[in-house]
Amino acid sequence: VDSEAHLQPAARWVAHGAGEILDGVQTFATLEQALADVDFTVATTARSRARFHYYCTPPELLEQLSERKQWVGQAALVFGREDSGLTNEELALADLLTGVPMQADYPSLNLGQAVMVYCYQLASLMGVNAAPQEAAAPEGQLRALRHRADALLDALEVGDDQKLRDWLHQRLGALPQRDTAMLHTLLHDIEKKLAK
């Protein structure tokens, strides 16, 4: 996002045989543009933020993503800048937040270390699954649920309560697919009642 670091000669020196990754880089002006076609976004953070309360550890993230593997078409794991991480506005674009638990006064890994921890933890998701796959839920299901929930908050005239909206968005990101589908049904019923 808004970077040309992959074009620098030093990027090839440290890529160690992964030049095809650098060759396939897509760039975007903003994180929001980069996530436009992503169904489920996970953002990494080292700091506790007042607006965001639910975090999962890397093992918990593996569990969350494993459950979603059958119904999420495209997922993104977002890392922040080396020096300052992600902004609150960027974190707000995520469905789920994750962090590596650390015992230190300033709990932070450098970017390379954080990427290694998550690559190691999530490597099993890239394996070939020989088991028959369940029918996938429609892509964008979580995004549609968020829009419906936001519309309901507006209809109830509490849409300007940013704390409530942030909390709701974070909790929706943690729901398994079955609960997401059930909540769509519930919101549909509520919408019908409100329309009367």
Swiss-Prot record:
<dbReference type="GO" id="GO:0005829">
    <property type="term" value="C:cytosol"/>
</dbReference>
<dbReference type="GO" id="GO:0008173">
    <property type="term" value="F:RNA methyltransferase activity"/>
</dbReference>
<feature type="binding site">
    <location>
        <begin position="107"/>
        <end position="109"/>
    </location>
    <ligand>
        <name>S-adenosyl-L-methionine</name>
    </ligand>
</feature>
<dbReference type="GO" id="GO:0002128">
    <property type="term" value="P:tRNA nucleoside ribose methylation"/>
</dbReference>
<feature type="binding site">
    <location>
        <begin position="44"/>
        <end position="46"/>
    </location>
    <ligand>
        <name>S-adenosyl-L-methionine</name>
    </ligand>
</feature>
<dbReference type="InterPro" id="IPR029028">
    <property type="entry name" value="Alpha/beta_knot_MTases"/>
</dbReference>
<feature type="binding site">
    <location>
        <position position="100"/>
    </location>
    <ligand>
        <name>S-adenosyl-L-methionine</name>
    </ligand>
</feature>
<protein>
    <recommendedName>
        <fullName>Uncharacterized tRNA/rRNA methyltransferase LasT</fullName>
        <ecNumber>2.1.1.-</ecNumber>
    </recommendedName>
</protein>
<dbReference type="GO" id="GO:0003723">
    <property type="term" value="F:RNA binding"/>
</dbReference>
<keyword id="KW-0949">S-adenosyl-L-methionine</keyword>
<keyword id="KW-0489">Methyltransferase</keyword>
<comment type="similarity">
    <text>Belongs to the class IV-like SAM-binding methyltransferase superfamily. RNA methyltransferase TrmH family.</text>
</comment>
<keyword id="KW-0808">Transferase</keyword>
<dbReference type="InterPro" id="IPR004384">
    <property type="entry name" value="RNA_MeTrfase_TrmJ/LasT"/>
</dbReference>
<feature type="binding site">
    <location>
        <position position="80"/>
    </location>
    <ligand>
        <name>S-adenosyl-L-methionine</name>
    </ligand>
</feature>
<dbReference type="InterPro" id="IPR029026">
    <property type="entry name" value="tRNA_m1G_MTases_N"/>
</dbReference>
<dbReference type="InterPro" id="IPR001537">
    <property type="entry name" value="SpoU_MeTrfase"/>
</dbReference>
<dbReference type="Pfam" id="PF00588">
    <property type="entry name" value="SpoU_methylase"/>
</dbReference>
